[in-house]
Amino acid sequence: PEESMKKRLATLTAPFICLDGMNEKGVSIAVLTLDSEPVHQDTGKPVITTTLAIRLVLDRAATTQEAVELLRQYDMFASSGRDYHFYITDATGDGRVIEYDCESEARELVAMPINAITNFYGLYKEKVLPDQRNGIYGHGRERYDAVSDVFEQQSGNYTDDTVWAALIAASQEPNPESITS
């Protein structure tokens, strides 16, 4: 009976613990870990956690802009002891990375147009060198550069093969000691 209760609880909570997804309007969201301290905003707005923010976007946003407007209504509390940023895109191709500025004491939300991101602050891309960790600014620049090269070669004429090539370019070998692997 105890095992059955655990399974029931897991089934009930699963919709609220998503990490990536796409809704019926074509809005997709992905969460990526960062190397900075977890954001814990405290401006007096209602507080939302990482996984609930994803659920909010998937349930209520029809565009990337709507997703940004929704997230701006909340103070972010990064869950699981990690910091994160979100990549959101919609059916029109409006892609943005949503970051909580690691150089700002208030950790303001910044929504920056970008066509790809990995595990570093897009806001501080110039401070991130490839093939190394870059303190609070993150890592994975080499994977971002590889994806950007794939996109540049296609000049905006993206096909399924382009997407597959970008995914392969961004892939990394599994590492049991890394949460981002």
Question: Which role does the model predict for each range below?
Answer:
Residues 73-78:
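A short structural micro-motif
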Residues 68:
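Extended, Lys/Arg-enriched charged tracts that mediate electrostatic binding to polyanionic substrates
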Residues 1-16, 20-60, 65, 81-84, ...:
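C-terminal, well-structured catalytic/ligand-binding subdomain of enzymes
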